[in-house]
């Protein structure tokens, strides 16, 4: 639970995310998704309750084992793509040799290698999100938290971004992603729907479809 001046933004939420799955937190703006992820990553303290990540009750203890992409682009706009990657690599304590090897590998994975000398400020919205994803991969996280990574991104870039998430997941990375888009719920192993700080339902997309008592029409 999280309260701000007697306003409850996350209300008695209980979740278990299984290793190796893509877990989606779906809900409209103001549902509490960002607050939830900030609590999970240790950026924000809980008002009551506890969080356990990778066997640790304190996320600080396992900070080096998970990655986080915030909703707002937070890298350096006046640095190039490669310079941003090198800075993040050095913050994680990687050697220059490791940074050089990892940077080429990760920029290749995210299709950003041809743009390695472009300033981050000059990237499109979709490419900025790819850069944020790449930066978070510099320490090979076991769990990756992504807060609405495709919001405001064009449909083609959204599809490419999800393809990269699938590749990461196949390599063993657990993905926890929030989104306001209902169609992205279909891409997840399991989905939790959040509204006004409360989890209303949680299950696989297939089971949730079967439980829905009305006809579903896709346009």
Regions found by a protein language model. Give the residues of each.
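Helix-to-loop junction immediately C-terminal to a conserved catalytic motif
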Residues: 41
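Conserved ABC ATPase "signature" region
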Residues: 86, 90, 97-115
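Conserved ABC ATPase signature
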Residues: 119-123
């Amino acid at each position: 639970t999280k309260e701000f001046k007697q306003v409850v933004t996350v209300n008695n939420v209980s979740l278990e995310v299984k290793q190796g799955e893509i877990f989606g937190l779906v809900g409209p703006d103001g549902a509490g998704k960002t607050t939830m992820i900030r609590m999970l990553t240790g950026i924000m303290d809980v008002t009551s309750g506890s969080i356990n990540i990778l066997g640790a009750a304190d996320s600080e203890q396992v900070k080096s084992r998970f990655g986080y992409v915030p909703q707002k682009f937070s890298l350096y706009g006046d640095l190039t793509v490669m310079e941003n990657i090198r800075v993040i690599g050095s913050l994680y304590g990687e050697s220059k040799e490791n940074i050089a090897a990892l940077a080429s590998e990760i920029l290749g994975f995210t299709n950003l290698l041809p743009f390695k000398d472009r300033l981050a400020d000059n990237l499109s919205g979709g490419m900025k999100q790819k850069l944020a994803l790449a930066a978070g991969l510099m320490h090979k996280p076991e769990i990756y938290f992504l807060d609405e990574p495709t919001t405001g991104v064009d449909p083609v870039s959204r599809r490419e971004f999800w393809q990269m998430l699938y590749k990461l997941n196949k390599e063993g990375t657990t993905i926890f992603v929030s989104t306001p888009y209902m169609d992205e719920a279909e891409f997840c192993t399991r989905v939790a729907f959040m509204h006004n700080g409360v989890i209303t339902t949680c299950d696989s997309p297939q089971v949730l479809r079967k439980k829905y008592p009305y006809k579903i029409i896709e346009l």
